[in-house]
């Protein structure tokens, strides 16, 4: 995944090759699920050019990127953490208005607890917030 945020305008551009879509969270609600990847993972050998996905962020928007190791993290009973639980936990944690690193830390701990503290797959979380337009140079 490659993402670029224009800090002056809030324009987010994303290319993904096999990772799940990102989520845009605004005022406590998921307002956009970024479209799924258009290119296959690099390791599959088939080369399709990725499509650049663009999203206009508003000041205060949060964006959550994650790998499938997050949503597929299984409990002892085999129940996946899932997208719904990911969204619910993230939205509730963001409502606590803690710094984003603390919110991400709590999310990772919730995922680890769900799978009895045994990491079963790659599990990456990136959480960002666009606060306001950057000043012109």
Name the predicted role of every residue range:
Residues 1-137:
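Conserved subregion of the PPM/PP2C metallophosphatase catalytic domain
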């Amino acid at each position: 995944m490659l993402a670029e945020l224009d800090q002056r305008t809030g324009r987010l551009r994303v290319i993904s090759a096999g990772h799940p879509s990102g989520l845009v969270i605004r005022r406590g609600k998921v307002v956009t699920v970024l479209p799924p990847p258009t290119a296959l993972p690099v390791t599959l050998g088939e080369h399709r050019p990725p499509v650049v996905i663009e999203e206009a962020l508003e000041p205060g928007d949060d964006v959550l990127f994650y790998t499938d190791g997050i949503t597929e993290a299984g409990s002892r009973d085999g129940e996946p953490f899932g997208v719904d639980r990911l969204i619910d936990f993230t939205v509730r944690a963001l409502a606590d208005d803690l710094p984003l690193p603390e919110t991400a830390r709590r999310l990772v701990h919730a995922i680890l607890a769900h799978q009895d503290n045994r990491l079963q797959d790659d599990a990456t979380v990136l959480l960002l917030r666009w606060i306001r337009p950057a000043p012109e140079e």
